[in-house]
Amino acid sequence: MTLKFEGYGYLITGSTSGIGQGIAKELLENGANVVINYAHNEDNANETRELFKQYENQTLFIKADVSNENDVKDMFDKISKRFGRLDGLVNNAVYDKIFSIEDLSVEEYRKELDVNVVGRWLCSKYAIPLLKESKRPRIINIASRLGTKPIDDSVAYCTSEAATMMLTQCCALELTPKYGIKVNTVSPSMTLTPFARKSYTEEEIKETANRNPSKRLGEVKDTVNAVLFLLSDKADYINGENLNVNGGILLK
């Protein structure tokens, strides 16, 4: 099965590291034009520029906070001027901090909801004028298995990921009949990104992997493959769904 992306245009939010960077890399290697978005980390952005140096003509780097409406509007203006088209939006930007319910502040709760829910809605909203002109328009929201199965000390994150799944369904219900835009969620479990490798010990990683029926943790490529399939013409009849990429961890 061949997935064709040459000449298509995509925005991947939060794409200077981890899963977002992996999605961008795969699309670039397949001939797509890709907008790389980041909010603050200039070091990651510069490393990604160097990594994608050979794709300079296919990339556009935009620093924008997805929870800030003016930033989002400006980002889509830049995309329109540079590429003049957009065929897919991958809402990958995320904010996640660990707090118990008692220790969680209003400011932190709002920050997680602003980035993880409001940000995904804002980007979807302002992507519509470009997406509706595409012959294969797609929106993919990257959520988490924690949107359906909560854990301790993550009330804000779990709530935001559950809300994202409903956002996906609402957008699919409204945007598909109007503009043909297909909207889906991809929900990975713990994934071995560079950040995860720094955040957990080898023993913690091994222990978590052993709890999974597949006896391993997710790799970036697992989520990348799911996203590229949903962006492709092979997934035209999949809409409003949540694709779990977790090795079967929700079965336990």
Question: Where do the PLM segments sit?
Answer:
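Substrate-binding pocket helix/loop in short-chain dehydrogenase/reductase
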Residues: 100-101, 105-113, 204, 208
